[in-house]
């Protein structure tokens, strides 16, 4: 199975906002992360853990977001995506096209929600 079959549309922001604004958006939308995008390309990712580590600080997302984004292509297999998540200790992967334009996001939760689509061999060898 390929990433494009399970990926979702990401929630993006295109301007530098405060952590308070970020927390409000994530809370109201039930999101675990936001992607900071410029000209269609992901420039940073901020996740709930980043907010917790910086709780109460008057900062903007640009100062704490992860800028070294690990991304995948829509044609990447779910197995490869899981391996990348495990190796890098991350739960979400932005999905980009051949021009590095953001086209989706894949999370561990997306994979878990679709576990019935995989056979037992996939997870348990």
List where the protein language model places each region:
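Tandem CBS (Bateman) regulatory domains
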Residues: 1-9, 23, 27, 45-86, ...
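Cytosolic beta-strand hydrophobic patch enriched in CBS
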Residues: 13-15, 32-45, 72-73, 91-105
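Active-site hotspot residues in diverse enzymes, especially metal/ion-binding acidic/histidine motifs
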Residues: 19
